[in-house]
Amino acid sequence: MPKRDLPWRSMPGTSKTSRNANYSPRARIGPRVDKASEWVHRPMYRKPRIYRTLRTADVPRGCEGPCKVQSYEQRHDISHVGKVMCISDVTRGNGITHRVGKRFCVKSVYILGKIWMDENIKLQNHTNSVMFWLVRDRRPYGTPMDFGHVFNMFDNEPSTATVKNDLRDRYQVLHKFYGKVTGGQYASNEQAIVKRFWKVNNHVVYNHQEAGKYENHTENALLLYMACTHASNPVYATLKIRIYFYDSLMN
C-alpha cells in the first residue's frame, strides 16, 4: 500500500525546505574566501585587547577638524648635486587648503608620481637610482639649505649621504626611499612609479606673516631632498605631493 503524500506536497506553489539552506542575516552572499582572508579582516571584537586600546585618533592631539589638504604638483630636474623643496608651505586663510592661524599639524604625507629619463639619455647603457629624504627642519631660517650643506657624503656620492654631525639636532630624517631607472637599447626600464604614504604628525609653526613660504616658518618645516647617483645623466621626476593637516587648538 503506497504511503499518502505529505500535506505540503499536495499544496500548489510550495516546496520542501532544504536543511542545508542558511537563512542567517550574517550568511555570506558573495563568493567564499579562504580562512586567511577571514582572519585578517576579522571584526574588532575578535581581536586582542591591545588592538582596541592603542588605536590612533583620527584628529591629532591638540588639533581640530576638518582635515585639510594641500597639493604640490611639479616636474623636478634631479641631478647629482641634489635638490630640495619645502612641502609645508600653507597660506593663511579660511579655505580647505589654508591654515587658520600660526600652528597646524601635518598628519600624513602622500607622494605620487613617476621617475623618468629623457629620450636621448634612456638610449645609453646605465643605471640611475634616485633617492628621496623627507626631513624635518626644527629651526628653519632664511632659505632651505642645499643638499650638500645638510648631508655629509663620501666621495660626493649621494647614496652615502647622512646628516652632518653639527646639524643632527636641527635636521631629522623622517623617511627615506629610492627608485631606480635603467637605460639601454634592449633591457631598459626608463621610468619607475613612485607611491608613498607616511604618517608624520609634524606640528608646524609659522610667524605672523600670511604667505606660505619657508622663510615664514619658525618651527618644524618639512623638506623633501632629492638626488640621483649618476654624475652626468640627470633624471626627471613628475610628482604630486599632498599633505593632510589639521589646525591647532592654540591658534
From Swiss-Prot:
A motif (Bipartite nuclear localization signal) lies at residues 3-20, 195-242. GO terms for molecular function: DNA binding; structural molecule activity; zinc ion binding. Keywords: Capsid protein, DNA-binding, Host nucleus, Host-virus interaction, Metal-binding, T=1 icosahedral capsid protein, Viral penetration into host nucleus, Virion, Virus entry into host cell, Zinc, Zinc-finger. InterPro entries: Gem_coat_AR1 (IPR000650), GV_A/BR1_coat (IPR000263), Viral_coat (IPR029053). It is found in: Virion; Host nucleus. A motif (Nuclear localization signal) lies at residues 35-49. Residues 12-23 have a biased composition (Polar residues). GO terms for biological process: symbiont entry into host cell; viral penetration into host nucleus. Pfam families: Gemini_coat (PF00844). A motif (Nuclear export signal) lies at residues 96-117. Residues 1-27 are annotated as: Disordered. A zinc finger (unnamed) spans 63-80. Belongs to the geminiviridae capsid protein family. Homomultimer. Binds to single-stranded and double-stranded viral DNA. Interacts (via nuclear localization signals) with host importin alpha-1a. Encapsidates the viral DNA into characteristic twinned ('geminate') particles. Binds the genomic viral ssDNA and shuttles it into and out of the cell nucleus. The CP of bipartite geminiviruses is not required for cell-to-cell or systemic movement. This is Capsid protein. It comes from Abutilon mosaic virus (isolate West India).
